[in-house]
Structure formats: structure tokens, C-alpha cells
Amino acid sequence: MKLNKRSILFAAVILLITTLIQCGVYVTDYYRADRDAIVAFQQHQTVTKQVLSDNTIAYVPHDAKQGIIFYPGGKVDTAAYEPLASSLSEQNIAVFLVEMPFHLAVLDADAADGIQDQYPEISSWYMAGHSLGGTMAAYYLEEHHESFEGLILLASYSTYDLSQTQLNVLSIAGSEDQVLSWDQYENNKIN
């Protein structure tokens, strides 16, 4: 009986260690930004990048009246979205890229909290996100839709019913996207 308990305990410890190693490998294996692309866009950007906190990068033009809070896709480096943020800021739109724990927006869906309060001069706010980030942006809007004009989804969909809100929704997906679950995308269009 004693041997059996030891064997079970040993197996449980091995299983726990294996699981922890697999989790560590999973969260450290993510899509990184192309450094050459980052360098190329930095040479031409006109709006200065600001680091607001440990988890938020901002591109805020001087007279911006519109702001976008952007949640990155699952396991995608936040820096990969900096060229997009810089381009939008050149159109006089403030963009806030929120870095997520372990590159997973599901771990901090409320990361947008407090950003709007820091910029009272911005009158129109939008949430945006790519892939998992878009789904979590929609989740955030389920509770905070009164303070936003709309939602922008890039290769994403809302699993939360926002149809009874006044939000404008823009959904963009590439026809050759082989990562997006097209069945889920179609099934959730109603939301």
C-alpha cells in the first residue's frame, strides 16, 4: 500500500512538472514583430511613440479627437501592431496598444480601464482587436459600451451579444485567412 501511494505521488509530481514545462513553452512561443518592418516604419513616423505604463504604448497626435484602444491577437507581439498604430496616428487618431500578459488578451480583458480618463480631450472612442484580442475587446464592450462609439474587429468576431447596443462595428477578415475559424466567424456575425 505504501508503494502504491508513493507511485501515485511520484506520478502526480511528474505530471505537474510536465504541465508546467508545457505551459512555459506555450506562453514563450509567440509571433514576434518583424524587426526590419519596425525599423522601416520608425524612419517615417511623424507621431512620437509614448510608453504610458508597463503595458500600454500610445501614439497620440496633438489634436486627436478620436481614440482607439487596441488589444493584440493571441500570442502576437504588441510591437507587430506599431506600424498600424503609427499610420492611424498620422490620420489624427490616437492609438493605444495594450500589451497583454503572456501575449494573451484573455488574461487581462479589462486592460483598457483608465485609458479614457487620461485623455478627456478625445471625444470619440473605439475598441479594436485582432483575433483573440478582438474577442476580448468585444467582451470589454459588453460592460462598457456606453463610453465607446464602436468596435473594430480584425480577423475576429464577438461571442458577446452587442446587437442591442448603439455601437458601430467594423469587421475585417482576409479571404485567405487560414487561422480564423470561418464557421465561428459566420455564426457570430449576428452579435
What are these regions (language model features)?
Residues 1-48:
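N-terminal membrane-anchoring alpha-helices
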Residues 128-137:
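Gly/Ala-rich beta-loop-alpha elbow adjacent to hydrolase catalytic centers
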Residues 165, 171-173:
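Short beta-strand/loop motif that positions the catalytic acidic residue
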Residues 85-105:
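Conserved alpha/beta-hydrolase
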Residues 65-73:
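Short beta-strand element of the alpha/beta-hydrolase
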Residues 49-65, 115-121:
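Short beta-strand-to-loop junctions in surface cap/lid or active-site-entrance loops
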Residues 147-158, 168:
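A conserved short beta-strand
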Residues 84, 180-190:
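Short alpha-helix in the alpha/beta-hydrolase fold that links the catalytic acid
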